[in-house]
Regions:
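Metallo-beta-lactamase
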Residues: 80-84, 103-181, 186
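Short, hinge-like loop/turn segments at secondary-structure boundaries
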Residues: 53-58, 147, 186-188
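Core catalytic region of metal-dependent phosphoesterases/phosphodiesterases
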Residues: 36-39, 184-190
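Cytochrome P450 C-terminal beta-domain/meander region
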Residues: 91-100
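Soluble, non-transmembrane catalytic domains of enzymes that act on hydrophobic metabolites at membranes
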Residues: 7-28, 96, 107, 144-150, ...
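A generic secondary-structure signal
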Residues: 1-2, 159
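Hydrophobic/aromatic beta-strand patches that form the interior of the parallel beta-sheet core
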Residues: 12, 38, 90-92, 107, ...
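Active-site HxH/HxHxD metal-binding segment of metal-dependent hydrolases
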Residues: 2-90
């Protein structure tokens, strides 16, 4: 790979799920830079390990009701989170604007996790959606996870539909560039 971790200077975390924080310590170790990690204020304690991540907490509450396979998965997940906790350098607020080459607006959405954020790049008209939205069979839809707050998801979609978005980038599933505002408004009605 031609990728050099030495080009990396900043990481903005959309939420504290393990697939979003899992390799940050590795990246920090491999880079010659002092990489700054940014996260929404209510996510910081989960990312640093001060609080148990919500999904892990929910699984731990069901430990007496789960089979051996799920218990094994819970143990692996717990170990994964513990090895992934990392320092957060910058705690973010809703509508905070960052200038990291282009102005980036922090949009607190909640829904997927309590402190989930999207990032809006006004000049590029790009929304980095984190795990708020996904593309399934070519169609834009909310992420359907059992721990998501459905009303917060709907409110978040309504909120982001007010931005001038031409491209949505997802954590899982690439890009979406077709009739974004119309599609978002239809998701609000559903």
């Amino acid at each position: 790979s031609n990728t050099s971790f030495d080009r990396l200077k900043n990481i903005i975390i959309t939420h504290h799920d393990i697939d979003h924080i899992g390799n940050i310590n590795y990246l920090r170790e491999k880079s010659k830079n002092n990489i700054k990690v940014y996260a929404y204020k209510s996510e910081v304690s989960y990312i640093t390990g001060e609080e148990t991540p919500f999904k892990l907490y929910m699984l731990e509450q069901m430990v007496d009701k789960i089979d051996d396979k799920m218990l094994s998965m819970l143990n692996v997940m717990g170990l994964g989170f513990k090895s992934s906790y990392t320092k957060v350098d910058v705690s973010l607020d809703n509508h905070e604007k960052l200038n990291l080459g282009e102005e980036i607006e922090v949009i607190h959405t909640g829904g997927h996790t309590r402190g989930h954020i999207c990032l809006y790049l006004k000049e590029s008209k790009v929304l980095i959606a984190g795990d708020l939205l996904q593309v399934e069979n070519g169609e834009l839809k909310p992420v359907d996870v059992m721990y998501s707050n459905k009303q917060e998801l709907k409110d978040a979609i309504k909120n982001i539909s007010n931005y001038n978005i031409e491209t949505i980038v997802f954590s899982h599933g690439g890009l979406y560039q077709r009739n974004i505002i119309g599609t978002l408004k239809n998701l609000i009605i559903e």
